[in-house]
């Protein structure tokens, strides 16, 4: 089956995923309601359940149905706009603080997959960024040296070293690369379904329902859904591209951006690492799954307004056609790849390329996270821990301060096109 009942294309991850986590009836009340079955929501429910909270995770479709189940499957530490640009905006201390959240999240993924026995094709094979043209080589390798001096696991690769990682000849335009040996790859839907199942084992309740409104009510919040209302002392909103539906004060500050992806029919193992490149200004990325399929996305540069502000999750022929040209251009012997399916998903971006994570403005007792700029995979696990700490202690952890909704660099998105950050 290549599409859902409403005609929305199914991703490779969804098509090869286990059955959805079963849904329970909505309770009348609980300690915490978590809204959204993506990275933030599922991990927050997991950590709260482990801490002994009575937690209900509400998702309108299924766990990993949004961005997570439509992405490239990378668990990569780092910052969407890079360290240098982020440090200019918020200072080096703040930039390293956010970087550490992503590194800690990556470590949590490895740890919990092992502890909970999650079968999700986890491979800590690293990711490599391709450098196109000799002019870029010195610039990129200089940034590698800066990060390495701060203890980041990163390596500069010349063309010969890069060729050792990739089992097909490189095109002449590839000059070298940047290798991140500690980054990992997963089957996105299997991975998050496994976290959700683990959360249930620890006592979390999963309910399929569509939340329509949050109402402050004394010392708690009424979570209004189409299926009923739940009273909770605390609420966590983790719906990323749809954040403004429940937290209106973030309208225009967190905006949806469509990402388009395709998968190829299986071929013999060629790419063991994740791969990123900037053939277009908005960037491309891919991994080869264990069954030999290649999942590749990017090329937003070919879409009107770079797909910023788009809420439809249907791919467009122009962008998919451009994506299909990327690998054959860079690896000439792979010019016979056959497209198996294509799909789209919604990311969420902010003007300063940093997520929002902390108290929701205008909603006492509500916490919110969103705007991950295509990098939610490493942030979700650690933010779930930090939200659990905030709810159990009643105070905001210092680690969340650079991501607060009232930071001066979080301005309305007007014309930013978010280049090369997928």
Predicted regions and their residues:
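Dinucleotide-binding Rossmann-like beta1-alpha1 core, especially the glycine-rich loop
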Residues: 78-161
């Amino acid at each position: 089956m290549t599409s859902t009942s409403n005609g929305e294309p199914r991703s490779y991850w969804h098509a090869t995923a286990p059955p959805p986590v079963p849904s329970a009836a909505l309770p009348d009340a609980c300690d915490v309601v978590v809204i959204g079955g993506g990275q933030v929501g599922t991990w927050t429910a997991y950590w709260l359940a482990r801490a002994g909270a009575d937690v209900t995770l509400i998702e309108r479709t299924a766990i990993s149905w949004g961005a997570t189940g439509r992405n490239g499957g990378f668990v990569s530490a780092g910052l969407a706009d890079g360290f240098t640009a982020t440090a200019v905006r918020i200072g080096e201390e703040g930039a390293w603080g956010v970087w550490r959240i992503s590194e800690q999240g990556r470590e949590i993924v490895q740890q919990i997959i092992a502890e909970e026995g999650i079968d999700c094709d986890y491979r800590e094979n690293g990711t490599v960024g391709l450098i196109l043209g000799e002019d870029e080589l010195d610039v990129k390798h200089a940034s590698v040296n800066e990060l390495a001096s701060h203890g980041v696991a990163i390596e500069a690769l010349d063309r010969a070293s890069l060729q050792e990682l990739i089992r097909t000849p490189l095109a002449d335009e590839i000059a070298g690369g940047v290798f991140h040996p500690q980054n990992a790859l997963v089957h996105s839907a299997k991975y998050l379904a496994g976290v959700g199942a683990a959360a249930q084992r620890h006592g979390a309740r999963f309910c399929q329902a569509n939340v329509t409104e949050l109402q402050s009510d004394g010392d708690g919040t009424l979570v209004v859904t189409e299926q009923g209302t739940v009273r909770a002392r605390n609420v966590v909103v983790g719906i990323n591209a749809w954040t403004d539906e429940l937290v209106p004060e973030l309208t225009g500050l967190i905006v949806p951006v469509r990402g388009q992806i395709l998968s190829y029919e299986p071929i013999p193992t060629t790419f063991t690492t994740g791969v990123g490149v900037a053939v277009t200004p908005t960037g491309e990325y891919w991994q080869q799954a264990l069954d030999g399929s290649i999942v590749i996305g990017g090329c937003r540069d070919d879409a009107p307004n770079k797909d910023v502000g788009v809420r439809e999750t249907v791919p467009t022929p122009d962008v998919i056609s451009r994506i299909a040209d990327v690998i054959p251009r860079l690896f000439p012997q792979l010019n016979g790849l056959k497209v198996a399916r294509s799909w789209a998903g919604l990311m969420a971006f902010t003007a300063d390329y940093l997520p929002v994570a902390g108290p929701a403005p205008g909603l006492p007792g509500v916490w919110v996270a969103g705007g991950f700029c295509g990098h939610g995979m490493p942030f979700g696990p650690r933010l779930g821990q930090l939200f659990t700490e905030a709810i159990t202690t009643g105070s905001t952890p210092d680690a969340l301060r650079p991501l607060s909704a009232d930071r001066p660099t979080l301005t309305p998105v007007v014309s930013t096109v978010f280049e090369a950050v997928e």
